[in-house]
Amino acid sequence: MNNYTYNVIVQLEGDSVTAGAAANAFSKHPSDTMVIQYSLTTRKYHVLHGDVTRAQSGKVRWITVGHGDYFGANNPTVYAYKSASEYTEGLNYLKQKVFNNHNPDKLVMLGCELSRGGINENFALKAVVLLGESHTNVPVVAYKREINVANNGQKRIYPTGKYGDSVTTEGYKMIYTYHSETGQVEINNRFAALHFINELRRGELTFAQLIQSSKIDPLRMF
């Protein structure tokens, strides 16, 4: 069930995989969804389908679609070849230029492994903080493994890579919430510090991944 009055799909790249994922996501709620192609580099955009005015009020969900690239080894993950700061700056521009400064009620980042890694690697963690600090305080959904959108609009996760078996998003879908009063982040309703400690215990992270960060102070999360 769709609990939003309108959905905005933002296609960040022009390749066939991204276009296919955007089209499949659109097929889920076609009468209540707009599709906009947007370049984070040039800030140019093109509305393929939908009514911009419906995205300027009400309960709106944004879904950005592009490739996530997770490198590991404490290297920052990129999304559509952009850093978290470039991505969030681009979204804030789009919000002001196209959507009359109307904040979305949720942001879904469709891209591989955007919720994977430690503090320096985790794209979604950085994005939700940067958005919150720029007055776009919105829950952010991201996934910690490779993801595909099927023809029926359903999301499937590939835990061992794109050539392995697929599963549902359960256990791989992470919802990030930024608390502007404290500067802290919750991930799936637990403080980020507890989330990362749990990831360390599960073998998802090394200790070096947990403590190293060039942008975010890990101690602030505690």
Predicted regions and their residues:
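Catalytic-core segments of thiol-dependent peptidases
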Residues: 2, 6-118, 204, 209, ...
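Active-site-proximal C-terminal subdomain of hydrolase catalytic domains
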Residues: 106-222
